[in-house]
């Protein structure tokens, strides 16, 4: 688990049972003396704990709306966004910095933390305005901080405490009986308090911790105390006042907070107990004595009784609590029965031993309550419980519980690295929970989880740590107990079978297996039931739940003879109708088959049936095979188990183990077309003694046995871990072996099988990369909708008033029209790819509204409000740059306030002047109207004004609202507010007032919404005869309309007014102050306030119809426009280059072919002859003579690098090459992005498609062909005019998947083509496949990993795959049986290959081989028989030599070393016959033989020539050869082809060569050259300079092929020629002449 971690939550004063002797502090001690001792021993307050508590208090504080105030101070403003902040604040600090200092424990004093918080809040007050939320939050939090700090850091005076306590004593000593009841009530309040989830808060405070388990507790805490002690003191009458008990409660809480870490549960519980006690104390002090005494009854005593007794007696205190409860109820029933006092209960309990205390501590630490111990749900005789309890209660020699660190998992907060290393964490608490839920069926399953827990601890901790040693000890104990239980189980099983008695164990096993089968069927059924369609979420099983109706589908029951549905299957599962799982699967398949048979192919039901059957198969495959039923075994089998020593192998496998096993088996069991198992040679590594150079070349050897052992030991946390080991094994084989070898090919094929298997198992689980384009468009859409639907308190949308803004600003007539409606269409058509462009368009509309309207108008205020709201929602959606980093975020609310204030300063003087002129004009118009009305007639001079008048039995007053007859008959009556009433000289009554307009009487846009029954106060006033009044109505102000209603008026006659309407400007403005005359109507409150409902305009329907009418033509005209993305306005940004070339104009940002490019961008470049275009990065760009160019590094794809085919690459990985080029911009195909590994996981540029985003973490060096990681690409600092990319950050980093090398498939095809034309080996390969059983039974001793490669390598040699003892016998037996079949294909190939080569001179070797093979297959049988007859005429190959090499020349009948070598006068395939030159294998009689026996390992043949041995097993060797020591190494030198190069570079002339030839002649030497020196030369001993390499005869070979350099290819040619020389000598029996 972790020796690295400390206990996250320590026990307070009570984690364990009470083995502590309470005598020294539970005796009756007088209050004052005890208090003095406490003062002397008072533990100091931990400043770090106080600092943590203060920080948490500030962090968790919320205001009235539930918002965390600390969010405003989590991070200081960014310098880029708010540079003026750093002009005001010299020492910036934020909560993140304070938290970091807390974690690093830099605060050793509370005053240091106080200084930092003061600096934080002072900075906020200095920068923000007093009315801002930040300023107010800073003030609130600072007050909270000081208040909390004063609570923690108290400076009490001992003398004052003494005086207080004496005062309390004097007041309370007079009534000791009543005091005891009060104290019991306080104790009860503390003891029974629970948290919201029902957990008992006081549980850990009832008993002191064990001295054995927590000795440090008593070293830190000088005055331990628990609730049991407090209860005893209450019963003993130790407390003389409430204050004395309060002191002990404070001490209890302080002890817990001193010992435990801040933030732990115990720390919080201590504060809660103190708070509960104080609240109860205050309640009692303010209550009446009588009521208090009535409340104090037996429950308090019962609570004290529980606390005074030990927490665990026997097997727990459950029974004790029950007994005490019974006594309580029994005493309550008796009328005059004595109460069960707490002290009586205290005497009933004895003290615990340290053993019980430690166990109780462990039980509580694990989170088990006494009433819920493991024995309550499991029999102690159960083997599962016994194994678990043995591990859990394991102790060391000192009696300490060594399993304690494994009770709970480490804290994720403190040990995040634990959860990174350990993929499947598990603890004893989780194992206990699984035991409780009966999830373990066998001991093996429980053992698997315990082993997983131990392996996790061993994996995380170092071997010499204490935890690691504990793990080893516990594993030994567990294994010993497991063997004991298994042995006991076997004996019991055997006895029970003999006696034919049914044991409980056997019945439980049968029952559990039956339950397991039923559970599996339920899982499979639920998998089908819960399957849903990926796109729509539709349940696929809906049409399969019940059979079709016979009434609706009568033909169904004629076609389908056996109907089946899911309801019937579920019924059968519930009632145990199915004998096994197969029966249920058969019914499922029948149901799907019926659906496919009845419905047409391609229909929804048909497709659903297919999909559900696939899901069912996958789920069944995931569950794995059914466990075998051991219960049906015969008695003999049962008895035989007793003699078995090894325990049963576990049949229980986790889903991950099943996947790992499936991958391993797929690689192990793969066979080729001939049935040959390719993995046989990879099972085991060669020994160091046989092949030491293998371990020099390969640094990390691995074989399949090692992989299997890791898999069995659960060392693989996931499939990728196993795949890495397999890839390393195949890479080792490819590194050591030659590229043309069969082993090399087998490694590549198995590598491909491995990747395909993993893809099948994981379902090609490539990490899902979010679609950034859709996310940006969704963000913009959400932002637009939020802004457009933003409403005020009355439910009015602010955007309604802005809909009336003209699309074109008169000040800028050339600008394209832009309105919210246009923006909405752009958003719906997903034309925005950048947030800053969307923000520019929105702000342009809002700023136009501000420019064109007065500062006191409704439109202006709404525009400002919407702009503020836009910024707020934008920052929330982008999380201030944590989700989306955009230049748009640089415009903040502060910038908006500055712009608005500046605008108001410019406009206010003009508006004041306009108001003044308007008032003068209105005054003149009023005077004119009075003059005109005065001159109209004498009647106006004789007006009689009054406050009311009557008409048609109705009385009208000033302030009343009336309906007035309309001017036209088809119109609604006008609404007028009466302001004046008079009667003229003619006796006619008149009224004068303000007209109110209905919405249809105003000019407005169809998008505007109105309140129901809304009217508008107009600027139109006029007089009307009273005779035209049609009736009364009421117009109410909006603030009263929803709450009040007028008396004696119908609802139809009541209207609401919120705004005034100006007929001149055709605009609306909210009414802030209702100034209409007071009405005589009486208003009463509404029973239920009216809801605020807004309705669409009457013009909306007609406008919508017109819009639909023209929508088709609009769509046709703008179909292209909707597809095109909107681009942000950019400009060419020139830059001065100090070292630039003359005539070149350099740019940081440039537009080329409608494509905007900037320095640092990556682009696709035209690349001729490559599969994919290369990627270049622009580091400079310039224009010269009208042509544009750029310069920068080039990135290459994996297929352009040299690497082993087994290498894995990330998808879309590129490599930075050494090549830096200057390219014309005409070769640019498009833009792309190349990200570092870290950025590739976390973010994406928003304007680049995911297909064009690449990953680069390595640089490829062309000279040494190496890939090395580098820090990162060069970054550029560009001017402000350059438009930065917007970056979207993922909420969760993606996990990039790797893919095989692009060379893998090509290399496999090449090698298959090469080996395909070697038809002579077909039958031998089949024989090898037949003999493979021996190979798999005993893992092979790998052979040569550098086999010689040519057409002769059709039957490589594999040594006997058994122990050294059996080598001799098997060699003789198999060697006598084995015959080497020489096929006529070899002779046919030697004749046909030159012909095909002449016809197709450009074909490669592999292509020629395929054509030769095709010709051979198409050849008539008679022709084939002729070739077979010709080849049979050649002498057979003799068995390989068993003797030493000496004297080999004298053996006249020597045969070729390798079977299948061409016979005399037979041309090897592909080599045309040349007249005058003998074919290979034919040497003149005058050639001298070359004899020599080099020492083992001296020279290349020790590792490169096949070793003679029994040819019985011919598996291809991927690993170095392993031969018995008795077998000789056959070597035969040949005429040297190369001489070691001179140490210095020299010019070799013909004359110099001739002189050296003369010097080399010697009478003592039988040969002209020093062939023995040449034979001993090795590749690794010869180092050539570049000049020497350039002078090599590279023209001998067409190309270097699969070799790294031309020198390697020539060395390979030399080895082949030497081998051919040896074979020729042996095949043709060449003797000394």
UniProtKB/Swiss-Prot annotation:
GO cellular component: RSC-type complex; SWI/SNF complex
Biased composition (Basic residues): 508-517
Main location as per UniProt: nucleus
Span of domain BAH: 954-1072, 1155-1271
GO process annotations (BP): chromatin remodeling; transcription elongation by RNA polymerase II
GO MF annotations, alphabetized: chromatin binding; DNA binding
Biased composition (Acidic residues): 158-167, 1320-1335
Disulfide linkage: none
Subcellular location as annotated: Nucleus
UniProt-listed Gene3D superfamilies: 2.30.30.490, Bromodomain-like
Biased composition (Basic and acidic residues): 900-931
InterPro entries the UniProt entry points to: BAH_dom, BAH_sf, Bromodomain, Bromodomain-like_sf, Bromodomain_CS, HMG_box_dom, HMG_box_dom_sf, PBRM1_BD5
Annotated segments matching region Disordered: 1-40, 155-174, 300-333, 484-517, 623-644, 900-940, 1319-1377, 1509-1531
Domain Bromo: 42-152, 174-284, 379-485, 512-623, 651-761, 767-877
Polar residues compositional bias, start-end: 300-315, 497-506, 1337-1349
DNA-binding region: 1378-1446
Keyword match Isomerase: no
Keyword list, A-Z: Bromodomain, Chromatin regulator, DNA-binding, Nucleus, Repeat, Transcription, Transcription regulation
Assembly and interaction partners: Component of the SWI/SNF-B (PBAF) chromatin-remodeling complex.
Protein's job: Involved in transcriptional activation and repression of select genes by chromatin remodeling (alteration of DNA-nucleosome topology).
Identification of the protein by name: Protein polybromo-1
Organism of provenance: Gallus gallus
Taxonomic lineage of the native organism: Eukaryota, Metazoa, Chordata, Craniata, Vertebrata
Designated gene of the protein: PBRM1
């Amino acid at each position: 688990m972790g020796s690295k971690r400390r206990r996250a939550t320590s026990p307070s004063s009570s984690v364990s049972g009470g083995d502590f002797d309470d005598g020294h502090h539970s005796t009756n001690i007088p209050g004052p003396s005890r208090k003095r001792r406490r003062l002397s021993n008072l533990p100091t307050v931990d400043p770090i704990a106080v600092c943590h508590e203060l920080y948490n208090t500030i962090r968790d504080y919320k205001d009235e709306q539930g918002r965390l105030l600390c969010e405003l101070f989590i991070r200081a403003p960014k310098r880029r966004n708010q540079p003026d902040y750093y002009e005001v604040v010299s020492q910036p600090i934020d909560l993140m910095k304070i938290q970091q200092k807390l974690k690093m424990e830099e605060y050793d004093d509370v005053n240091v933390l106080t200084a930092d918080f003061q600096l934080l809040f002072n900075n906020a007050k200095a920068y923000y305005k007093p009315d801002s939320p930040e300023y107010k939050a800073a003030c609130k939090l600072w007050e909270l901080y000081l208040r909390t700090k004063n609570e923690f850091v108290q400076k009490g005076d001992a003398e004052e405490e003494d005086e207080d306590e004496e005062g309390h004593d004097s007041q309370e000593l007079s009534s000791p009986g009543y005091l005891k009841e009060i104290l019991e009530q306080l104790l009860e309040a503390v003891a029974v308090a629970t948290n919201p989830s029902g957990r008992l808060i006081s549980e850990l405070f009832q008993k002191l911790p064990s001295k054995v388990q927590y000795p440090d507790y008593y070293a830190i805490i000088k005055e331990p105390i628990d609730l049991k002690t407090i209860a005893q003191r209450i019963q003993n009458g130790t407390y003389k006042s409430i204050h004395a008990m309060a002191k002990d409660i404070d001490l209890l809480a302080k002890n817990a907070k001193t010992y435990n870490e801040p933030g732990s549960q115990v720390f919080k519980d201590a504060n809660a107990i103190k708070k509960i006690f104080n609240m109860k104390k205050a309640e009692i002090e303010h209550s009446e004595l009588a009521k208090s005494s009535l409340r104090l009854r037996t429950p308090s005593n019962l609570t004290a009784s529980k606390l005074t007794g030990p927490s665990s007696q026997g097997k727990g205190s459950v029974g004790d609590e029950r007994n005490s409860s019974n006594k309580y109820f029994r005493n309550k029933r008796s009328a005059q029965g004595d109460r069960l006092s707490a002290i009586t209960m205290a005497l009933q309990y004895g003290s615990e031993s340290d053993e019980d205390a430690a166990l109780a501590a462990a039980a509580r630490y694990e989170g088990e309550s006494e009433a819920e111990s493991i024995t309550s749900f499991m029999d102690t005789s159960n083997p599962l419980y016994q194994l678990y309890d043995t591990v859990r209660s394991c102790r060391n020699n000192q009696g300490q519980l060594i399993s304690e660190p494994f009770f709970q998992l480490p804290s994720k907060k403190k040990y995040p690295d634990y959860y990174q290393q350990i993929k499947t964490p598990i603890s004893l608490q989780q194992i206990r929970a699984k035991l409780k839920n009966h999830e373990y069926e066998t001991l093996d399953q429980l053992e698997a989880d315990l082993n997983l827990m131990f392996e996790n601890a061993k994996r995380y901790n170092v071997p010499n740590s204490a935890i690691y040693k504990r793990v080893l000890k516990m594993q030994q104990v567990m294994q010993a107990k497991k063997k004991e239980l298994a042995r006991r189980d076997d004996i019991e099983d055997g006895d029970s079978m003999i006696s034919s008695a049914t044991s409980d164990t056997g019945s439980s096993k049968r029952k559990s297996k039956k339950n397991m089968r039923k559970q599996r069927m339920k899982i499979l059924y639920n998998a089908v039931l819960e399957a849903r369609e990926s796109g729509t979420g539709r349940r696929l099983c809906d049409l399969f739940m019940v059979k079709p109706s016979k009434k609706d589908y009568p033909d169904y029951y004629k076609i389908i003879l056996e109907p089946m549905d899911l309801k019937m299957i579920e019924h059968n599962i519930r009632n145990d109708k199915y004998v096994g799982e197969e029966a249920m699967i058969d019914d499922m398949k029948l149901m799907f088959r019926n659906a496919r048979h009845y419905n047409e192919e391609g229909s929804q039901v048909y497709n659903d049936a297919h999909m559900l059957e696939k899901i069912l198969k996958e789920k069944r495959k995931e569950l794995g095979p059914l466990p075998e039923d051991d219960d049906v075994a015969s008695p003999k089998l049962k008895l035989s188990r007793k003699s078995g020593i090894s325990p049963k192998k576990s049949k229980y496998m986790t889903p991950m183990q099943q996947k790992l096993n499936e991958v391993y088996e797929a690689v192990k069991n793969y066979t080729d077309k001939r049935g040959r198992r390719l993995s046989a040679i990879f099972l085991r590594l060669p020994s160091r003694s046989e092949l030491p150079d293998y371990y020099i070349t390969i640094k990390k050897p691995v074989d399949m046995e090692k992989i299997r052992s890791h898999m069995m030991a659960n060392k693989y946390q996931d499939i990728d871990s196993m795949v890495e080991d397999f890839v390393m094994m195949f890479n080792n084989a490819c590194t050591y072996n030659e590229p043309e070898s069969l082993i090399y090919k087998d490694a590549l094929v198995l590598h491909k099988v491995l990747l395909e298997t993993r893809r099948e198992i994981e379902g090609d689980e490539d990490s899902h990369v979010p679609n950034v384009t859709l996310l940006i468009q969704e963000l913009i859409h959400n932002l637009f909708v939020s802004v457009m639907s933003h409403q005020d308190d009355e439910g009015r949308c602010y955007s309604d008033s802005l809909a009336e803004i003209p699309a074109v600003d008169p000040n800028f007539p050339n600008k394209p029209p832009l309105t919210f409606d246009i923006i909405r269409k752009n958003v719906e058509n997903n034309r925005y790819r950048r947030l800053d462009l969307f923000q520019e368009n929105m702000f342009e509309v809002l700023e136009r509204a501000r420019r064109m309207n007065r500062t006191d108008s409704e439109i202006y205020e709404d525009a400002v409000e919407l702009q503020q709201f836009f910024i707020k929602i934008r920052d929330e959606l982008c999380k201030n740059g944590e989700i989306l980093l955009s230049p748009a975020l640089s415009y903040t609310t502060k910038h908006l306030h500055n712009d608005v204030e500046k605008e108001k300063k410019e406009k206010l003087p003009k508006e004041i002047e306009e108001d003044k002129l308007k008032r003068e004009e209105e005054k003149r118009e009023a005077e004119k109207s009075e003059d005109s009305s005065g001159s109209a007639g004498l009647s106006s001079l004789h007006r009689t004004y009054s406050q009311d008048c009557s008409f048609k039995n109705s009385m009208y007053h000033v302030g009343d609202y009336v309906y007035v007859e309309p001017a036209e008959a088809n119109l609604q009556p006008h609404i007028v507010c009466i302001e004046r009433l008079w009667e003229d000289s003619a006796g006619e009554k008149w009224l004068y007032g303000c007209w109110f307009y209905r919405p249809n009487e105003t000019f407005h846009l169809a998008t505007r919404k109105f309140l129901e029954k809304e009217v508008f106060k107009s600027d139109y006033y006029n007089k009307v005869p009273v005779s035209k009044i049609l009736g009364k109505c009421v117009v109410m102000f909006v603030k009263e309309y929803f709450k009040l209603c007028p008396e004696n008026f119908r609802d139809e006659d009541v209207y609401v007014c919120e705004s005034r309407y100006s007929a001149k400007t055709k605009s609306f403005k909210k009414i802030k102050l209702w100034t209409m005359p007071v009405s005589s109507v009486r208003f009463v409150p509404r029973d239920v306030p009216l809801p605020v409902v807004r309705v669409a305009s009457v013009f909306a329907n007609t406008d919508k119809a017109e819009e639909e009418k023209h929508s088709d033509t609009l769509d046709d005209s703008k179909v292209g426009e909707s597809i095109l993305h909107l681009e942000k306005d950019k400009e060419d940004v020139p830059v001065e280059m100090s070292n630039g070339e003359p005539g070149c104009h350099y740019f940081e940002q440039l537009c080329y072919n409608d494509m905007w490019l900037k320095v640092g961008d990556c682009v696709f470049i035209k690349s001729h002859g490559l599969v994919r275009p290369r990627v270049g990065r622009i580091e400079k760009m310039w224009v010269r003579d009208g042509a544009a160019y750029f310069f920068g590094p080039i990135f290459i794809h994996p297929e352009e690098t040299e690497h082993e085919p087994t290498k894995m690459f990330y998808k879309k990985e590129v490599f930075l090459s050494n090549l830096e080029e200057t390219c014309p911009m005409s070769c640019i195909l498009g833009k792309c992005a190349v990200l570092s590994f870290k950025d590739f996981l976390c973010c994406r540029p928003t304007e680049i498609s995911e297909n064009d985003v690449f990953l680069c973490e390595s640089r490829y060096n062309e000279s040494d062909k190496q890939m090395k990681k580098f820090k990162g690409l060069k970054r550029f600092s560009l001017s402000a005019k350059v438009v930065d990319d917007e970056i979207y950050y993922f909420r969760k980093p993606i996990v990039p998947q790797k893919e095989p090398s692009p060379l893998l498939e090509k290399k496999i095809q090449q090698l298959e083509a090469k080996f395909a034309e070697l038809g002579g080996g077909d039958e031998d390969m089949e024989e090898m496949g037949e003999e493979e059983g021996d190979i798999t039974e005993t893992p092979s001793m790998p052979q040569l990993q550098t086999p010689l490669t040519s057409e002769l390598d059709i039957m490589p040699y594999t040594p006997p795959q058994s122990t050294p003892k059996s080598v001799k016998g098997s060699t003789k037996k198999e060697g006598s049986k084995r015959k080497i079949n020489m096929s006529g294909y070899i002779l046919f190939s030697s004749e046909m290959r030159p012909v095909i080569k002449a016809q197709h001179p450009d074909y490669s070797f592999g292509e020629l081989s395929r054509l030769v093979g095709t010709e051979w297959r198409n050849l008539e049988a008679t022709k084939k028989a002729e070739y077979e007859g010709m080849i049979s005429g050649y002498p057979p190959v003799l068995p390989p030599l068993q003797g030493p090499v000496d004297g080999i020349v004298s053996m006249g009948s020597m045969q070729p070393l390798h079977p299948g070598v061409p016979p005399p006068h037979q041309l090897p395939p592909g080599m045309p016959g040349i007249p005058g030159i003998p074919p290979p294998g034919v040497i003149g009689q005058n050639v001298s033989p070359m004899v020599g026996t080099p020492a083992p390992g001296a020279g290349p043949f020790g590792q490169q020539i096949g070793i003679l041995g029994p040819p019985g097993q011919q598996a291809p060797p991927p690993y170095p050869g392993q031969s018995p020591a008795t077998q000789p190494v056959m070597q035969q030198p040949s005429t040297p082809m190369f001489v070691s190069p001179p140490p210095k570079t020299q010019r070799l002339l013909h004359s110099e060569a001739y002189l050296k030839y003369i010097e080399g002649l010697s009478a003592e030497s039988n040969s002209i050259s020093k062939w023995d020196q040449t034979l001993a030369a090795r590749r690794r001993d010869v180092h050539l300079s570049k000049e020497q390499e350039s002078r090599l005869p590279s023209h001998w070979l067409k190309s270097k092929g699969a070799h790294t350099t031309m020198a390697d290819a020539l060395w390979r040619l030399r080895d082949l020629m030497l081998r051919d020389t040896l074979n020729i000598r042996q095949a043709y029996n060449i003797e000394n002449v």
